[in-house]
């Protein structure tokens, strides 16, 4: 079973809640996503999410608040294949309003450029399906 760790990085600005999201700069068809990555063999999912936030967004000083949810999801393209998903809450107080970052690390997205921005609570429905499944636990 593939294991995935998702990062819900939140902030409050002018009394409004938002979650960090990104688009693939050169592939708009990929939709709006939150940072996530595959848990390596023997790796703790909490360490995965911190690593992925650093590699995908350059936010190497993001602070992990905790695990929000864990589930198992069958993949629509192959129902026999499932993902164990871990959703974590993090904060990154010094993150800019918008920026681009070239992905680092050993994953298949190495070298891609992601355009980051803060997605307000009222636009959470714009996230790629499955990415916002547990945001209701922290953004009200």
What are these regions (language model features)?
Residues 29-32, 97-140:
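Nudix hydrolase/Nudix homology domain
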Residues 1-34:
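N-terminal strand-loop-strand
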Residues 39-43, 81, 113:
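Short, solvent-exposed loop/helix junctions and linker helices
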Residues 72-104, 117, 137-139:
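Active-site-adjacent beta-strand/loop module that shapes the phosphate/pyrophosphate-binding cleft
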Residues 11, 61, 90-94, 120-123:
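Non-catalytic surface loops within mature trypsin-like serine protease
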Residues 13-15, 27-29, 40-41, 70-74, ...:
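Short, charged/polar surface micro-motifs in flexible loops or helix N-caps
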Residues 34-67:
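The catalytic Nudix box helix
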Residues 2-6, 83-87, 113:
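Short hydrophobic/aromatic beta-strand or adjacent loop that forms the aromatic wall/cage
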């Amino acid at each position: 079973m593939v294991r995935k760790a998702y990062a819900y990085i939140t902030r409050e600005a002018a009394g409004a809640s938002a979650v960090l999201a990104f688009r693939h700069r050169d592939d708009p068809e990929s939709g709006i996503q939150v940072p996530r990555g595959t848990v390596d063999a023997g790796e703790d999912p909490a360490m995965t999410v911190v690593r992925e936030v650093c590699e995908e967004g350059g936010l190497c000083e993001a602070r992990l608040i905790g695990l929000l949810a864990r589930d198992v999801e069958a993949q629509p393209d192959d129902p026999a294949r499932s993902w164990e998903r871990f959703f974590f809450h993090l904060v990154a107080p010094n993150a800019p309003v918008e920026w681009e970052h070239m992905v680092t690390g050993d994953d298949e997205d190495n070298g891609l450029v992601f355009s980051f921005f803060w997605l307000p609570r009222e636009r959470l429905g714009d996230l790629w399906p499955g990415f916002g499944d547990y945001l209701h636990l922290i953004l009200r």
